[in-house]
Design a protein with these regions (language model features):
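Structural/interface elements that position substrates and couple domains in central-metabolism enzymes
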Residues: 1-197
Length: 197
């Protein structure tokens, strides 16, 4: 959220934890230890570019793009518990409007975006994916403590549930991210479209 706001975009952060929301709105990092988060967060909050809330549906209704980064827990047998992800998806669906891009960045089992969340978003919003809203999976490729560095260092991978979704996902991430120049990659560092298979 801070990265997107630092590019001049108005960003809403939604969280179920009221203390996290309070800290963010005060410009105080809720998770100490992230390099440069303290100064970057204070800057974007003071400029009015980042606001946090517990009301996900209301800020989704005001947004052109929704990026989902919610923990997915896995038990000892490797079975994922989708409880938090499902709850977030239902809240997003309540506020979803035509033309919105929804991007899941949480690491998910293959096919989850298309086979689980697309239907939940459609059912909860009355909208149709690919026609009324766009849906992509774009796994976060960052390590705690160096998020801003990793966002610049690694290509942003985007896979859409359809061609139009992939196109919108690529366009979105090109607007909100910066990339380091790297000669060791097979093509220019940036947003890489994985297609829509």
């Amino acid at each position: 959220a801070v990265q997107f706001a630092s590019k001049g975009h108005t960003v809403f952060g939604a969280d179920v934890n009221e203390e996290t929301v309070r800290l963010v709105n005060a410009g105080t990092e809720p998770f100490p230890g992230e390099t440069d988060l303290d100064t970057k967060l204070a800057d974007v909050v003071s400029k009015g570019l980042l606001t946090a809330t517990t009301d996900t549906a209301s800020v989704v209704a005001e947004s052109e793009a929704v990026v989902v980064v919610v923990p997915l827990f896995v038990d000892a047998e490797g079975t994922p518990d989708f409880g938090w992800m499902d709850a977030a998806t239902r809240d997003i669906a309540k506020g979803l409007k035509p033309g919105t891009l929804v991007s899941y960045e949480t690491t998910l089992p293959v096919g989850t975006t298309r086979n689980r969340f697309a239907q939940m978003l459609e059912d909860g919003s009355g909208l149709k994916v690919g026609t009324d809203f766009h849906l992509v999976f774009s796994p976060e490729r960052v390590f705690t403590g160096r998020v801003f560095e990793d966002l610049r260092k690694y290509p942003k991978l985007v896979g859409g549930v359809d061609e139009a979704s992939a196109k919108h996902g690529v366009e979105f991430y090109e607007q909100v991210l910066d990339f380091d120049v790297r000669s060791d990659l097979p093509k220019a560092n940036g947003v890489w479209d994985l297609g829509s298979s």
